[in-house]
């Protein structure tokens, strides 16, 4: 067990916060600062190489300030994962629910993710790199696979609704097409986080939307 993975002995049992505030703590805004910095560094370095000391240095905090909010690196990673899932995946699916058809649902999901990307690219970077970390670290696998399954089921559900509505042919292989679309969407996440600019991402989504509704060619 590394130093970052060990629980903080001074932490109150059953609570993530300790009594009192260490230097440089400032309530929720400090916690969000830690989460964003951790999200950036987990994406850049991977789970294994990222340390509390590096997070504290980049965030302009002390290591005790990080420990004030998070007992261990796994605790912090879980909080970063949950934040990314809420802001990207959950928000995207909520936006898609209001769309009237399959192209609209998939486009709405991607546009919601793009909006988050315009404000903070570290979300796309973390979600993409989290899958890679899940293959290297068994303790991270369940959450990453659950998130992937959630997106997979969203896509499959949209396809089944499209079949029932007569938007696509009835003999469509939902499983195979779902995997294809998940692969495309994961690739867009990689593109958003590490390759293209935000304007380029918007253009990619526009073209993908046209591909879905049959107006690209």
Where are these regions (language model features)?
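Amphipathic alpha-helical packing segments from all-alpha helical-bundle domains
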Residues: 89, 119-122, 138-165, 176, ...
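Amphipathic alpha-helical segments used for helix-helix packing
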Residues: 104-105, 118-142
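Hydrophobic alpha-helical connector segments
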Residues: 79, 90-123, 174-181, 202-205
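Short coil/turn segments at alpha/beta junctions that flank glycine-rich nucleotide-binding fingerprints
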Residues: 44-48, 99, 120, 165
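Helix-turn-helix
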Residues: 2, 33, 37-75, 79
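C-terminal peripheral helix-coil segments that are non-catalytic and often amphipathic
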Residues: 1-21, 108-116, 152-153, 157-161, ...
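Short, basic, alpha-helical segments at the C-terminal edge of helix-turn-helix-like DNA-binding modules
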Residues: 82-88
